[in-house]
From Swiss-Prot:
The gene is DCL2. Residues 956-1099, 1141-1323 form the RNase III domain. Belongs to the helicase family. Dicer subfamily. Residues 54-234 form the Helicase ATP-binding domain. One of its GO terms (cellular component) is cytoplasm. Its cofactor is Mg(2+); Mn(2+). A motif (DEAH box) lies at residues 175-178. This is Dicer-like protein 2. The lineage of its organism: Eukaryota, Fungi, Dikarya, Ascomycota, Pezizomycotina. Pfam families: DEAD, Dicer_dimer, Helicase_C, Ribonuclease_3. SMART domains: DEXDc, HELICc, RIBOc. Residues 591-684 form the Dicer dsRNA-binding fold domain. It comes from Coccidioides immitis (strain RS) (Valley fever fungus). It comes from the Eukaryota.
Amino acid sequence: MSAHTTAEQSPKRRRIHLDNDSKMHFSSILEDGTSKSQEALLPPRRARGYQLEMLSESLRQNIIVAMDTGSGKTEIAILRIQRELERCPAHKFVWFMAPTVALVEQQHSAISKQLPAFQTRLLTGAANVSHWSTKKIWDDILLNIRIVISTPQVLLDALSNGFVDLHTISLLVFDEAHHCVRDAPANRIMRDFYHYHRQEEGTDGLPHILGLTASPTTRARQTDLEVLEINLNAVCVTPKMHREEMMQFVHMPEYRSIEYQPDVQNFSSIVEKLSVIINELDIENDPFVKFMRRRNDLKSRQRLLDALENKKTPCLDQLKRCLRRSRVIHRELGPWASERFLTRCIMGLKSKQTNASGPQWADWDREDNSYMLNVLSQVVSSTEMGVQNPPDELSRKVHKLIDFLVLEHVNGSIGIVFAEERTIVIMLAQLLSLHPRTKHIKTTAFLGSSASVSRKSDITELHNPIDQSTAIDDLRTGKKDLIIATAVLEEGIDVPICDLVICFDLPKDLRSFIQRRGRARKKGSKFALFLHSEDRATSSELHLMEKTMKQLYLENKRALEHIQYLENVEEEGYDGFRVASTGALLTLSNARNHLSHFCGTLSAEFIATDPEFVLEGDDTTGFSAKVILPSFLDPKLREFRGILLWKTEKMAKRDASFQAYVALYEAGLVNDYLMPAHHHIDDEDGLEQVEKRPSFAKALGSLNPWAAIAKKWREAKHFYQNLIEISAGAQAFPPMVMVLPVELPCDISFRLFWNEHSTLLVSVKRGGQDFAADLIRLAADTTSILLSSLFSQKMVPGSLDFSWLFLPQMESIPSAIREWCDSVTGTISLHDIRDCDMAGFENPGLVRPMDNTARPCTFEKLVWRKYVPAETSDGASLSEQVTYDREVPHIEGRVWPKRTDFLHRLEPSNTSKAHHTAKCFYPANNCSVDRLPVEYSQFALFIPCLIHSIENYFIANELAQTILHPVGFSNLSLVLTAISSSAAREASNYQRLEFLGDSLLKLHTSIQLAADHPLWPEGRLTMRKGNIVSNGYLANAALQTGLDKFILTKPFTGAKWRPSYNTDHINTGDMTEPTREMSTKVLADVVEALIGAANIDGGENKILNCLKIFIPDIKWSPLNECVNILHHQEDSFSDENNNMLSEIEGLVGYTFKKKPLLLAAVTHPSSKGSGHSYQRLEFVGDSILDIIVVQELFESPRCFHHFDMHLMRTALVNADFLAFLCMNAYREEDRGEAVENSKRRVTVAMTKRRAYLWGFMKHSASWDIVNAQQRAAKQYEKLHEEIDEKLRSSKTYPWTLLCRLDAAKFFSDIVESILGAIFIDSQGSMPACRIFLERIGLIPYLKRVLSEDLDLMHPKERLGLLAGTLSVKYETKRTQGVEPQRWECAARVGDEEVVRVDCRVSRVDAETTAAEAAVAILKTRKLQSEASNKVAECD
């Protein structure tokens, strides 16, 4: 048996029995006459439960969907087409048929926009399908086509000629299926081909059938419905209407009848003149007769005889048709309209004559045109044609219409006037647009589309095809508010809800009557019919229609009253559900409200969140309900059924809601207070919205490691000596020893900056525990000597209780140390130096002026020079002594720096004398020189820096050995960097590590949460992750663990440095101060920096240990374990077959082992089905993308500054950039296009069609999504070449162009969800993820960012920098009265409006464009100002 059960074989037929139920069915049509256009005009609507019910039924068997106009039949068809194409072989396709060209064009537009991944083909007469005369042409035209949209006649002809095989069609869709009767083309397709094959071969291989209709028959007879079902081999089904929906008030129009008296049939002189001229025409002058007389063949002679006998030629036919229509117009509209009609016919002929010079015009075409123009020009003179008189002589019927419109068509009204004749439609529209009383009404005309050759050449066809193509859109957008139309607008065509529908000509039957009335749905709407007072037959028919309609209304009203009565029946429910810990109670009464609230808190763009109910049963058996929850919930938590049968639908829905909410509670999505867990975070959870944190927190004072060391001095029996070496290129310093009672944490090295040009490298190497206790006192003496050389005023006199001891590297015996101390103690006076005798000064110490008027200096040499006030080489005076003419001995040397901070580079702008080491000259007789060699004094000068650096390592080590002990850091420098804030001005700070750690934290948190909570929706995962990685939460973790006391925030300056004594530390304790104010951001940053440091020090294991310390709320697991869990979770994904996936795999460059992962990755959360959507995968992919980019930036050999890395990451992972990459990803496929040459021979030219990645996204046939796709695609077509060029070669990032795409979030979501799917399917393979990113263009641009110096700063950020201290404001607003919606923005800096931009596609576009323009202006001003200053300086 085939997949689609036949009508006769169906075990669950839900037939509409018109003899019993037809009145209710038709009444619902009368009540709800919304057109298909409401999907675009009303708020966005997802696939409703009844639409999914119809979809499911269509997948099971052939059906005719009978649903009210405006209830979403087209969406059902689109969902069905998508499902069919996903499961059918690639060589098969879908054929969609609609009865009119206008409807075909409309449905082609809808389907191609809704299903952009599939090639569609519109086939109408305009494509000259009748000239496609070979099968090869058809095969080429249908190559790679998956959906064909045409009228039934096109398919019938193709099947009849054998150009198309019915077995290659997988699904036939009949829109307005009630036309499939008798000898209609749709029925001939079924009768001559479908049923023929069915009888011969069975249904195997035949297409599935889907019919769509709002009115199954035009007459209310059961037999007619049975015939329709037989014709389409389908069952007519309709979804069950909920009482709740039926009880909602629907505005029914007020019926009005407009009676008019027909005009006396006295035609105007012009019409009569045309009649006379046509009757008096000499047929021998007719172009056709002349042409045939010139031919001698038998066929031509016969055609000539027929023309002469019947007086029938092409020109005569058109002229007579023109006469007939002018008379109809005269009768219906009046003399003015008929005369204006003839004038327009003449103008049309003149226009054709002007344009008839091309090769496509045959000679007889020109002759016919000239002949008819000559005839008609005798009727209306050129003078009369040039006069544009306002409508004056009008029919009584038109006067009645104008009176009615003036009264009823008020401001804001939208109306339709139905007329039968095409020429009446055109002329009535022109008449109303020109009449003084109605010209304020914005009137247009709509005839539908027709590609008939006869109509193309008909001189009476006055409509403009361009106007026809925009008429409906103009009505939707408000450019027009009244449309005059033929019956083509009765059904199918999307038009807005109207409040005024007028039948200028009466409907032909009940169905037409119902369809027209259905267009009037607004509150207070009017439905008016023009009645000919003398036409009794018409009046009788209309009376029957009115009677039928009133009867339907009355019965519907009674039914609604009965339903309301039934729903008010009180029923006793079952016991509620009580939470023991809180006492919260869930009952049948409050369950539905709870459920609605829960769903509402998970709102997202393009997703309707209200629960849907599907009812089963009836008044006899009782009702049960199924509730369908939004698709962002896991499929296991998406559908729930009530457990009992109820008398009322109300209680059935409450029952289903109760069961659903209990299940949500048990799944952990509802907390103990019966509130959504994702929306109401419990205080005791520790994850409250800590982003509402203060900027600063009270933190512990900085740790003082010397306090613990001071205690060790009192207790230690053995001491550690550590070697200190200082080098500066060729210059060598004597090695020194540092003695401590504890072991150094590690070898230490750092740099010292002696002056602007000289940098020293300090190395401290740990030594053994081999310094004798009896040498401690001597080491204290050496320390005192060293410190006294420079810090005597800061020392405690007589105290040797230092926290650390220093001495030169020498033999560790008392005599050697004493000898050294004796040799370096004291000074030598230079007062008596003569003849530059340098004996005894082989290794001199610092030279000091005896009057202390100047800083010490080094001793380089003794020189003779005139006695002048001592000065340095830069001219700084060092004394005020009198100048002598004779030369005296001077000490030449370098000034000793006054500063003690050598850990920081000297800035070029710093001119403080404390930094100078310039050359100087001191009079020798006023100086003394230290016995302590200058190298030791220089070492003493470095002691503050040395102590500070060692102190930091002791702090870092204490942290590593206590709080961070589980991590097991091996590189203490990483810990030190991680706890060093930028304010501390250490050699390295945490910012780069924090940048890496932030990404690692998000990665592990995202993957862990996704693995631990398979039922959590993306919204809750995101909120939970956001809380965990928030600065507030991490700052709290730092305070809770005591990390705060280890954080370095105070910069070293050395300005107030003094030697450290053990006694002081014992008295003050292990804190430098009790508490301090610390930025909570710094606290959080240090936690992230430690995570980054752990990664560098030991990879994932150390990261996990670090996470366990600071975030113990989560049970952390290795990434591979989490990925395995996620990989196995895929087993619960939908396993439905989808042939589309291989195309996506080719596009993304990865073949999935588990195909449902890819299907989920391209499924929008609005999509209805049994599978997952992309939201959770996007949640995972976001963190994968971030870590790939961050690691590349962090590991770059260029060692970027953290600020630059932030700019780079933002440029590479922002939503606009990802959206562009998504829109720029495509695969090409062949497409054939018919080409007709001048001889009307048809060939097929092969072209390429791009299938874009975004087009494969599955969704719920949402017009909001489609419109967003189309807007962005339109912008992409305008901008993509420029954006591509900017990304390839520009030095500036195209922020403005990217935001101008106005791309919805789902474009970037697709990139991240596919990345997440690849990561899980490959079980954590980053190379596989990189291949995808390489393919879509992200990695190539990342390489540019890494290798080139690009300006990546956002214009708004750049403007803020240029503004300096001035404020920057953006005054943004919508541009009024512009369609489509546009924005304008003024950028203000301080009080000045720098620039104003308009006509932008979004608020973001407006502000970004304004910022970019303002930046350009301010930069120009700056350059001009600098140029002016230079000119001024030159002057």
